[in-house]
Amino acid sequence: MENYVPFLVSHWRTVGLISVSIAAGVALGQLNQTHERAANKSQRVHTNSSIKAKQVKRESAIEQINEIEDDDEQSLEDQDVLPILFQYEKPSEADSIRRSEEFYRRMNQRRSVREISSDPVALEVIENIIKTGGTSPSGAHTEPWTFVVVSNLEMKQQIRQIIEAEEEINYKQRMGDVWVQDLQPVGTTWVKEYLTEAPWLILIFKQVHGFKRNGQKKIHYYNEISVSIATGFLLAAIQEAGLVTVTTTPLNCGPSIRVLLGRPVNEKLLLLLPVGYPKVGATVPDFKRKPLHDIMVHYQ
């Protein structure tokens, strides 16, 4: 070592630079190894993610295949449905205008009436109204509706108790000041006398799904839209029969009422219609309907 001292003293800058370069090279090599290990790890993670993504995609494809198979099975169930000739007699233009105008005039008398008489209404009238609702179109002709009609006073009292208990909470806590204020012109509260005074209650359930002949679930396409359209048919039939109703949406009451009525879990309460004749002297808010030019857009 003593023999190298004069050399180191004379060339210490060069030796220092070489040492620093060597150290930097070693550090760089270690850094590259670290990056390489990280890259390999990232590649493995990416590969695993890709594998998982492919697995999810594969499982999704399997689910789609299963759905297609379900649809095929449903089609097989309906394979005996053959087309028939549509029975139709075209009216004259004058007759079509007359009929449409007469129907409009009758429907324009429809109002939401909350003061409903307890005067009896024949069961046959209610059955005809329900049959009319059953003529409504539905997604893939699944007819995803159940209309529960109640005339039993004790059952109506239990339904009213459930609804009023929830409605009081709705008005005081859930709905908010703006919603409650918007209802003031209508004059509604959580007290619903018509639920026990009306001779009939029609509870409208949507079937979230049905069941095939083999017991498997059957898809009910657009079930809520289909049932809502059917409700429109019911409202028209009620008006045509000379009866009144008010469309109610029992918020947060569905499960309790479903259990009370013994309905299956695939049915969800959508709407409730109390049906009967109006009380003598019944009043309604003096609302005006929008004119035609506000609700119709015509492109020629």
Curated annotation (Swiss-Prot):
Cofactors demanded by this protein: FMN
User: What Enzyme Commission number(s) does the record list for this chain?
Assistant: 1.21.1.1
Question: Which superkingdom, per the lineage?
Answer: Eukaryota
Is Protease one of the keywords?
no
Query: What residues form the membrane-spanning segments?
Result: 15-31
- Name the positions where 3,5-diiodo-L-tyrosine binds: 140, 167, 171, 192
Entry keyword Transport: no
Q: What is this protein called?
A: Iodotyrosine deiodinase
- EC main class here is oxidoreductase
* UniProt membrane topology term: Single-pass membrane protein
Location comes to:
Membrane
Residues bound to 3-iodo-L-tyrosine are 140, 167, 171, 192
Alphabetically ordered keywords of this record: Flavoprotein, FMN, Membrane, NADP, Oxidoreductase, Transmembrane, Transmembrane helix
Q: Which PANTHER family match?
A: IODOTYROSINE DEIODINASE 1, NADPH NITROREDUCTASE
Annotated FMN binding lies at: 110-114, 138-139, 247-249, 289
The record lists the organism as: Daphnia pulex (Water flea)
Q: Where does this protein chiefly localize?
A: membrane
What's one GO-annotated cellular component?
plasma membrane
Q: State the family it belongs to.
A: Belongs to the nitroreductase family.
Please give the biological process terms from Gene Ontology that the record holds: tyrosine metabolic process
- PTM notes: May be cleaved at Gln-55. The cleaved form retains catalytic activity.
Q: Which reaction does it catalyse?
A: 2 iodide + L-tyrosine + 2 NADP(+) = 3,5-diiodo-L-tyrosine + 2 NADPH + H(+); iodide + L-tyrosine + NADP(+) = 3-iodo-L-tyrosine + NADPH; 3-iodo-L-tyrosine + iodide + NADP(+) = 3,5-diiodo-L-tyrosine + NADPH + H(+); L-tyrosine + chloride + NADP(+) = 3-chloro-L-tyrosine + NADPH
Example GO molecular function: iodotyrosine deiodinase activity
Gene3D superfamilies registered for this protein in UniProt: NADH Oxidase (3.40.109.10)
